[in-house]
């Protein structure tokens, strides 16, 4: 919650870059399916820190019936330490989802990062390890006996690659074990590819795929893939 309040203050800073991504698809073969997604992303980078924020809205219908309706907000901060390769991070996420076993979910993770590899040559790429702990807090649970507050660990990797000036590929994989029993856990996987179509206009083609799996809440585990147009604001 502290990082959520800090995020609001940080967003007031002028030194931010914002991007808008729009994705839409529709089909009318065996059934009529319509989906859309809106991402508003922001980032701020300095020598000693970096911040990332995201607001995502997703909606879908099939044969006139609503099949998806969720909103997610994220804020992540990374701070470099005096020790080379080491750093600290804070990751806050808040989600409202009509079609899960909960109405709202707040997650918070704090911990350390270690830079496994970094290449600043023509093909820039880096790989970081992430480790720490935090919690998830759910409301509106379908199961009245389920715990609303659960402490969690956080282990994972994240990296990025720039094969050329126009291509950027990012990916991350995180495991969140339930510290109350360790038999339950969450995983989150994300892959993001961006191709710059028009550098002057800040227009890009973006393909994003993510998957979340939760053994305790039976969160949908299917890949969420979207082809989007991204523009700099």
Q: Residue spans of the language-model regions?
A:
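Residues that define the transmembrane beta-barrel architecture of outer-membrane proteins
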Residues: 16, 32-36, 67-71, 104-108, ...
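Transmembrane beta-strands of outer-membrane beta-barrel pores
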Residues: 24-28, 46, 57-61, 92-98, ...
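Repeated loop/turn-to-beta-strand initiation elements of outer-membrane beta-barrel proteins
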Residues: 16, 47-53, 83-88, 119-124, ...
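Outer-membrane beta-barrel transmembrane domain signature
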Residues: 122-204
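Structural signature of outer-membrane beta-barrel channels/translocons
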Residues: 27, 41-47, 78-82, 95, ...
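Outer-membrane beta-barrel "beta-signal"
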Residues: 206, 221-233
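Membrane-embedded beta-strand positions of outer-membrane beta-barrel proteins
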Residues: 20-22, 53-55, 88-92, 110, ...
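Cleavable N-terminal export/targeting peptides
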Residues: 1-15
């Amino acid at each position: 919650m502290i990082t959520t309040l800090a995020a609001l203050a940080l967003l007031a800073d002028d030194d931010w870059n914002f991007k808008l991504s729009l994705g839409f698809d529709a089909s009318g073969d065996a059934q009529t399916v319509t989906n859309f997604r809106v991402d508003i992303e922001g980032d701020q980078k300095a020598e000693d820190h970096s911040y990332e924020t995201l607001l995502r809205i997703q909606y879908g219908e099939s044969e006139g019936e609503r099949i998806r309706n969720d909103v997610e907000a994220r804020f992540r901060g990374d701070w470099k330490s005096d020790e080379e390769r080491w750093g600290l991070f804070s990751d806050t996420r808040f989600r409202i989802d009509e079609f899960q076993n909960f109405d709202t979910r707040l997650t918070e993770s704090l911990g350390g990062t270690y830079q496994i590899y970094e290449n600043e040559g023509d093909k820039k790429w880096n790989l970081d390890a992430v480790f720490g702990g935090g919690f998830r807090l759910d409301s509106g649970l379908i199961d009245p006996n389920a715990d609303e507050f659960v402490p969690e660990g956080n282990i994972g990797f994240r990296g990025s690659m720039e094969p050329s000036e126009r291509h950027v590929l990012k990916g991350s994989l995180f495991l969140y074990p339930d510290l109350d029993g360790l038999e339950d856990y969450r995983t989150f996987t994300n892959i993001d590819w961006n191709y710059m179509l028009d550098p002057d206009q800040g227009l890009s083609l973006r393909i994003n795929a993510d998957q979340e799996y939760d053994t305790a809440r039976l969160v949908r585990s299917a890949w969420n893939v979207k082809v989007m147009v991204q523009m700099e604001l």
